[in-house]
């Protein structure tokens, strides 16, 4: 084992020999990060990425100034999906150390799960991993039900069944109930709904290779809300929350769904399929119907839903949609507290009517006449939320995954959004 490289913090500028804006310097004792008070967490994260790029795989965070947030910023930049890294953490008080350990356990689970190859992580495996994580932090306060394959069709989950039937791996619905009260009649405070498409080829509306090569990550919404519930539990969540994960592959086969098919949902809505690559909203609809039936105060769905959100925001922000201004403000306040990037995009009543079909009540995709793809996708989902004007948040997870490394992130999953949703649940 190589000796650890010491990483220390300083509020003094680097020696002029390192350059006017140097963020780190190297000396006989190790590496010093020079904080300027403007964006210290970002500076630490970017420096960690550079340190990893130097091939330094064993570090010791040493000296004064380290807390849970700064340690976590370092780890966010240092962690990468390939190779191993070791960090010797500084002395923290018990509360700070527990917070850091919980982030390392849960958000690393989210990142590693999203990064897993689709061959290893099918719908059933994703559902079981979610159960295992929540059970690990909640113990006997959790019950769950897994419904799969033809049982989904028999029970009316037609969106999930239709999308997933083209794969040899059966589609799965996970319904998990975290009930710390022990009272089976306790009201449900919140429902979390996640898109769990474990691989998305686009179906017969097939993706080009350049857009398909990262589609193992199309279950990022499911991983994010699972991590958020687990993290909220570690922060003392004392209200009943239900989790619905809609898990499937979207593949091509003789049994796969086709353009022009019409799906009839349990709430009576009929949807014409005009793009099999707009499948995420079709599976989420089933989860949102179940969530609405619980009559919760709060419904949050999360999905890697549209390329339009990425076009608007890149991979730097999650896109937020809601008709409920006060609730959207609460989510954005939680994001600010957790130093996670969210940006609200438009969602208006007219977006709900921008999905016309000649053969059904709704089309599953907008047309050239209505190009606001992320907003019309949110508008589509609103048709499956009973009281869509209050208590509902839709997160289009554009910041979940990066195909290529940047100055603060390695390639792969980021884990962003977990802490924000957990913060909102425990506020």
Swiss-Prot record:
Presence of the UniProt keyword Manganese in the record: yes
Quaternary structure and interacting proteins, as annotated: Homohexamer.
GO molecular function annotations of the record: manganese ion binding; metalloaminopeptidase activity
UniProt xrefs under InterPro entries: Leucine_aapep/pepB (IPR011356), M17_PepB-like_N (IPR047620), Pept_M17_PepB (IPR008330), Peptidase_M17_C (IPR000819)
One cellular component (GO) term of this entry: cytoplasm
Keyword Manganese listed: yes
Classification via Pfam families: DUF3663 (PF12404), Peptidase_M17 (PF00883)
Taxonomic source organism: Escherichia coli (strain SMS-3-5 / SECEC)
Subcellular location: Cytoplasm
Binding-site residues, Mn(2+) 2: 195, 200, 218, 279
Name recorded for this polypeptide: Peptidase B
Needed cofactors: Mn(2+)
PROSITE patterns: CYTOSOL_AP
GO biological process, one term: proteolysis
Keyword tags: Aminopeptidase, Cytoplasm, Hydrolase, Manganese, Metal-binding, Protease
Cofactor: how and how many bound: Binds 2 manganese ions per subunit.
Signal peptide range: none
Family, per entry: Belongs to the peptidase M17 family.
Catalysed reactions, as listed in the record: Release of an N-terminal amino acid, Xaa, from a peptide or arylamide. Xaa is preferably Glu or Asp but may be other amino acids, including Leu, Met, His, Cys and Gln
HAMAP family, per the entry: Aminopeptidase_M17
Active site positions: 207, 281
Disulfide bonds: none
UniProt-annotated binding residues for Mn(2+) 1: 200, 277, 279
EC code: 3.4.11.23
